[in-house]
Amino acid sequence: MKRVRTEQIQMAVSCYLKRRQYVDSDGPLKQGLRLSQTAEEMAANLTVQSESGCANIVSAAPCQAEPQQYEVQFGRLRNFLTDSDSQHSHEVMPLLYPLFVYLHLNLVQNSPKSTVESFYSRFHGMFLQNASQKDVIEQLQTTQTIQDILSNFKLRAFLDNKYVVRLQEDSYNYLIRYLQSDNNTALCKVLTLHIHLDVQPAKRTDYQLYASGSSSRSENNGLEPPDMPSPILQNEAALEVLQESIKRVKDGPPSLTTICFYAFYNTEQLLNTAEISPDSKLLAAGFDNSCIKLWSLRSKKLKSEPHQVDVSRIHLACDILEEEDDEDDNAGTEMKILRGHCGPVYSTRFLADSSGLLSCSEDMSIRYWDLGSFTNTVLYQGHAYPVWDLDISPYSLYFASGSHDRTARLWSFDRTYPLRIYAGHLADVDCVKFHPNSNYLATGSTDKTVRLWSAQQGNSVRLFTGHRGPVLSLAFSPNGKYLASAGEDQRLKLWDLASGTLYKELRGHTDNITSLTFSPDSGLIASASMDNSVRVWDIRNTYCSAPADGSSSELVGVYTGQMSNVLSVQFMACNLLLVTGITQENQEH
């Protein structure tokens, strides 16, 4: 009853202060409104309080000590342990070896060579008597750079894993008292970041058994089970074999990619483009007769959601309305036709969540299609000539277009006019592609160049030259390091974005390259060509000599079939390669 009365008073005061227009009047009161707590919350708070505090941490923050202090603090700890006759000192002595190794590695990374040599020459002798430690100590002598550490398996294992040291609870408290007695920031940093102290609780006396209330003498006769030795946490031999196996798999040739081919048969109108949605549920194709066709790739049929206005069914007052059978519409269809353009459709792009579709056409317009109602909801205009290509930025914030008017343009979905115009090419902009971070836009042109633009500033930051024909396709690696370009010169060029230079040139196709895509791990790139083939390249390493047909040695697979034209290739997240193309049935005469 008293609690309810207190809450009523607080609410009354809060209402009064609000009426008087005091700013944030209920802020202090809200802090005291919680007067009850569940049993689970109380138990969690007690656990946090018991497990936190100075007794359970070595250092609250890894402070940075001067390199000269490494030698001073380590020498002080060594002298403290060797000069003491306490049993705790003998138990803490094994901690000196990992401390020495980690301090030496830190000095190699952050200090001059003279400081490293002074630290090593002063303390390394105390560890040479132990055969297991001697090997690592001798390897430290030849370690001078971070590259030396990374190339050494045992030293790299120290950085990749925490060294485990077991201490009794009394010895652990003994060590903590020493660390708190003086300036030992370098030691605290190593203990916090690189060493795991496995503290073994001290055995309780008979008096502690009774006082704790957690057990009784009748149950265990005052005896605790003996400590069972736990298995070795770090088996160097097994760890070395495992990491060597991982390295062989990573550096070895990749496994062949699984391909799923979607073929178009007997297209009455010329098929210009085809694309599969990111969720692999829809296939969109643009035709010369200005229509876009959508197919469902799943067993579920395409069904239109109800929309407010249907312009194809506007009734006048004089019309005689008859009941229509909408059973077919409710059941859905396997294909939908989107009409709205008045010229050939050259490119289509799905949004990242597959909720919408963008298309561009010879009619100089870009249209947005709602894939819920399968209707055209937005018309974007700004180009003065046909629009050849589209691309949507990651997370579907912006989209870009390339046109016959020699410009690329940046758009947002909520505005029907372009936000940026990228001018600089001397001929048509045939393809556009966003960088994975959305800050850059790449464009390929008929003028045989590739340009990289700052999406926000609108200026050109890279110019890549070397193609001998129009550039028809672009692709960024998912890690953002490389840009691939290809076109009518039948060569695939890989550019290093950081240096702005050519990284690799891949040869093998015998006709125009029309589509490029990177694998999710940026290790493979697939290319589609009008020579009716799909080729997969491993851009990381070269494993064998060049094939007999003159292709580059990076080629790992060639896929051909009954195709007259391959339209696009798309890598999915599961490393599945989706291919779309046109297949004509053989006719016997």
From Swiss-Prot:
Belongs to the WD repeat TAF5 family. SUPFAM superfamilies: Taf5 N-terminal domain-like, WD40 repeat-like. Its main location: nucleus. This is TAF5-like RNA polymerase II p300/CBP-associated factor-associated factor 65 kDa subunit 5L. Functions as a component of the PCAF complex. The PCAF complex is capable of efficiently acetylating histones in a nucleosomal context. The PCAF complex could be considered as the human version of the yeast SAGA complex. With TAF6L, acts as an epigenetic regulator essential for somatic reprogramming. Regulates target genes through H3K9ac deposition and MYC recruitment which trigger MYC regulatory network to orchestrate gene expression programs to control embryonic stem cell state. GO terms for molecular function: transcription coactivator activity. The lineage of its organism: Eukaryota, Metazoa, Chordata, Craniata, Vertebrata. GO terms for cellular component: cytoplasmic ribonucleoprotein granule; nuclear speck; nucleus; SAGA complex; transcription factor TFTC complex. It comes from Homo sapiens. Pfam families: TFIID_NTD2 (PF04494), WD40 (PF00400). WD repeats lie at residues 266-305, 340-379, 382-421, 424-463, 466-505, 508-547. GO terms for biological process: positive regulation of DNA-templated transcription; regulation of DNA repair; regulation of DNA-templated transcription; regulation of RNA splicing; regulation of somatic stem cell population maintenance; regulation of transcription by RNA polymerase II; transcription by RNA polymerase II. The PCAF complex is composed of a number of TBP-associated factors (TAFS), such as TAF5, TAF5L, TAF6, TAF6L, TAF9, TAF10 and TAF12, PCAF, and also PCAF-associated factors (PAFs), such as TADA2L/ADA2, TADA3L/ADA3 and SPT3. Component of the STAGA transcription coactivator-HAT complex, at least composed of SUPT3H, GCN5L2, TAF5L, TAF6L, SUPT7L, TADA3L, TAD1L, TAF10, TAF12, TRRAP and TAF9. It is found in: Nucleus. CDD domains: TAF5_NTD2, WD40. Residues 211-230 are annotated as: Disordered. Residues 211-221 have a biased composition (Polar residues). Keywords: Nucleus, Repeat, Transcription, Transcription regulation, WD repeat.
